[in-house]
Swiss-Prot record:
Organism: Homo sapiens (Human)
Pfam families the UniProt entry points to: cEGF, FXa_inhibition, Matrilin_ccoil, VWA
Name of the protein in its database record: Matrilin-4
Keywords for the protein's UniProt record, in alphabetical order: Coiled coil, Disulfide bond, EGF-like domain, Glycoprotein, Repeat, Secreted, Signal
Coiled-coil region: 591-622
Signal peptide: 1-18
Domain of life: Eukaryota
Length: 622
């Protein structure tokens, strides 16, 4: 009958199962495979027949390459119900699978084959049970072993399983219904339907089934993995190597016979093995001598094409230029520039650092004197001010630059008289949102403020400067946040640091801040927009807007900011002109000078008008 493999009792013509189990060498290598056995354990299967089926399963396992990345095996048994013996994910060792099969107890009820196929399709071959995902394209194979006619329908559910990519082998024993076997199996039927006359012959089917899974010529299939040569044998193979090589421990790779390992090569640096021979090789930056064993360093500087401005140093990787002390190598790798110690060291200058050869010195602004420590300058007169710093923490600033901003803020704090009665300092960071790092009333000393500044964490994200200005106006200068009452006439100063264009509108709250009497300063770095800086700052912009091309040069702004933020306590009604080096006196001096100029300008205009009137009268008399 076409499509049906009958197994007559011709044991002498077939190799016994036990002989197959004793074969040595590599096991069957089918590649990755998800294999589920569906075993009929209904009451019609007698105990000794079930034991034969148990031995059949264990024998078939011994011929498979079992492992998480090779063949995964699951077993289910069924009668009137379905029971999972072990899923695909349960075991990766053959010994554990055999132990579970030995403990298998038959269910001894009806024969619901369709129910078993449905369970295999929906549960046993699910990813949760250990089947590999469909995108990995690992074949899914079900082997159904039954001895009777199903008591439910199998054709429709088997078709669904095949449509999901499950390849079905149907093995019938003794009284099995041939029509049901054909309805379950995958095409071509003559390769997927087997009929065994008795349980005694089911082991002989195992040989044929294993041969069908494994193929006959593993070397020809190309999956053997031999590096040099594959020698095929029945259901097995072994690898050999070309002359001059030996087989590695994995029995697939080939290693050159290492003549270098004998230690008689005489190579100064490296010995490189080749089939039947060897040669010497030097490290990078060295050349092999005529004796083909010793090595000499290459003097790249002697070639005369290094173009180094100061000195050339030969290294194994090639020529390297080196600069004399007090100079730094430039990005071109050749030229040298005098080192700017002010940018390269923590100089500690309060105002300005000036590099001088291999050293540096600190400078103070006009009207202020350098102190004995050679770094600090005498302070402006102590005064009262509430100062809120708005710091841009957007992603464009970047973490390393944010640290420079914090250092810059602390340099401003250094020249302030920080105390509850003197200058109070608050800090707000903004990006896509606004966060008060510490309010005006929290810290009473400069040391506490500086420590809190260093602890501020970088926010990243966007640049909502308008939102930050609103927060400052509505919250930061409130008495609840530590600002002093307006009745005390303590100046309120806002200082904004930003490096880019705001992502929201700033005009409303920039104007509102000035209406509230807040003196606004704007410090821009890098790509900061000048128009926005001017809109934020108070008038005149020349005194309230500062700009630096990058974060590394912000320290040059300190002198102007220190002179500008120094508090004003109001102009005295007296006419005495005090030293303009003091902030209050300087403002008073400038104010009175501007007032005098305005008065002179008005008088000049009036005098000019009177002269024009006299000229007109004289012209009329003539």
């Amino acid at each position: 009958m076409r499509g049906l493999l009958c197994w007559p009792v011709l044991l002498l013509l077939l190799q016994p199962w036990e002989t197959q189990l004793q074969l040595t060498g590599p096991r069957c290598h089918t590649g990755p495979l998800d294999l589920v056995f569906v075993i009929d354990s209904s009451r019609s299967v007698r105990p000794f027949e079930f034991e034969t089926m148990r031995q059949f399963l264990m024998g078939l396992l011994r011929g498979l390459n079992v492992g998480p990345n090779a063949t995964r095996v699951g077993v289910i048994q069924y009668s009137s119900q379905v029971q999972s013996v072990f899923p695909l994910r349960a075991f990766s060792r053959r010994e554990d699978m055999e132990r579970a099969i030995r403990d298998l107890v038959p269910l001894a009820q009806g024969t619901m084959t369709g129910l078993a196929i449905q369970y295999a399709m929906n549960v046993a071959f699910s990813v949760a049970e250990g089947a590999r995902p469909p995108e990995e394209r690992v074949p899914r194979v079900a082997v159904i072993v039954t001895d009777g006619r199903p008591q439910d329908r199998v054709a429709e559910v088997a078709a669904q399983a095949r449509a999901r990519g499950i390849e079905i082998y149907a093995v019938g024993v003794q009284r099995a219904d041939v029509g049901s076997l054909r309805a379950m199996a995958s095409p071509p039927l003559d390769e997927h339907v087997f009929l065994v006359e008795s349980f005694d012959l089911i082991q002989e089917f195992g040989l044929q089934f294993q041969s069908r899974l494994c193929g006959k010529d593993q070397c020809a299939e190309g999956g053997h993995g031999c590096q040099h040569q594959c020698v095929n044998a029945w259901a097995m193979f072994h690898c050999t190597c070309n002359p001059g090589y030996k087989l590695a421990a994995d029995n697939k790779s080939c290693l050159a016979i290492d003549l270098c390992a004998e230690g008689t090569h005489g190579c100064e640096h490296h010995c490189v093995n080749s089939p039947g021979s060897y040669f010497c090789h030097c490290q990078v930056g060295f050349v092999l001598q005529q004796d083909q064993r010793s090595c000499r360093a290459i003097d790249y500087c002697s070639f005369g094409n290094h173009s180094c401005q100061h000195e050339c140093v030969s290294t194994p990787g090639g020529p390297r230029c080196h600069c004399r002390e007090g100079h730094d190598l430039q990005p071109d790798g050749r030229s040298c520039q005098v080192r700017d110690l002010c940018n390269g060291v923590d100089h500690g200058c309060e105002f300005q650092c000036v590099s001088e050869g291999l050293s540096y010195r600190c400078l103070c602004p006009e009207g202020r004197q350098l102190q004995a420590d050679g770094k600090s300058c005498n302070r402006c007169r102590e005064g009262h001010v509430d100062l809120v710093l708005l710091v841009d923490g957007s992603k464009s600033v970047r973490p390393q630059n944010f640290e420079l901003v914090k250092r810059f803020v602390n340099q401003i704090v250094d020249f302030l008289d920080v105390s509850p009665e003197g200058t109070r300092v608050g800090l707000v960071q903004f990006s896509s949102r606004v966060r008060t790092e510490f309010p005006l009333g929290r810290y009473g000393t400069a040391a506490e403020v500086k420590q809190a500044v260093l602890a501020v964490e970088y926010m990243e994200r966007g640049t909502m400067t308008g939102l930050a200005l609103r927060h400052m106006v509505e919250h930061s200068f409130s008495e609840a946040q530590g600002a002093r009452p307006r009745a005390l006439n303590v100046p309120r100063v806002g200082l904004v640091f930003t490096d880019g264009r705001s992502q929201d509108d700033i005009s409303v709250w920039a104007a509102r801040a000035k209406e509230e009497g807040i003196v606004m300063y704007a410090v821009g770095v890098g790509k900061a927009v000048e128009a926005e800086l001017r809109e934020i700052a108070s008038e005149p912009a020349e005194l309230h807007v500062s700009y630096a091309p990058d974060f590394g040069t912000m320290t040059h702004l300190l002198e102007n900011l220190r002179g500008s933020i120094c508090p004003e306590e109001g102009i005295s009604a007296g006419t005495e002109l005090r030293s303009p080096c003091e902030c209050e006196s300087l403002v008073e001096f400038q104010g009175r000078t501007l007032g005098a100029l305005e008065s002179l300008t008005l008088n000049l205009a009036q005098l000019t008008a009177r002269l024009e009137d006299l000229e007109n009268q004289l012209a009329n008399q003539k």
